[in-house]
Amino acid sequence: LHNQFYAMGQEVLSQINRTVRAFVTHDRDLAKEVIEQDAEVNEYELKLEKKSFEIIALQQPVSQDLRTVLTVLKAVSDLERMGDHAVSIAEATIRMKGEQRIPAVEEEIKKMGRDVKDFVETTLELYLNGSVDKAYEVATMDEKINHYFENIRDLATEEIRKNPDAIVTGRDYFQVISYLERIGDYAKNICEWVVYFETGKIVEL
């Protein structure tokens, strides 16, 4: 289960990486590939859910084994939602064809996307090899993502004030940073599931 989960995580990580790149380079073809890639992520989710339910039904796991299955089920759901948000960013990339862009905002979105990708990557490593202390430490990366969200929102608002023609573009920027911020939230959720796996306690980090 853990290995399949990690493989699904790598697929989602690729989606996040490619969707941010597509958005800031205005690459609609790459955005379409991200959307197509979502079918693979959904396939992973279905396989992992099926395997988990089979283990519960056939083996009737207790204690640590049951926690393993429950952790996978919850974390898989978080990964799948990350993939959905990557698709939403790709759809925004396609929708923005011909719209006026704001380079300063896109540069910050690029940085935010890079740090979101790093957060997800670190979370996946934590899932395979982590500890409770490490989970608490990794979860703090979400604060940086939240700061990006606030700063880019303020920057975009200021730029639109100076150039009202960019208001449609601004709406898409707000959506994209919102999707990235939510991906960060789901990464933090996985940190919480690591704590549950190790201790049996449900916590909010």
Predicted regions and their residues:
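Cytosolic, long alpha-helical scaffolding segments
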Residues: 1-205
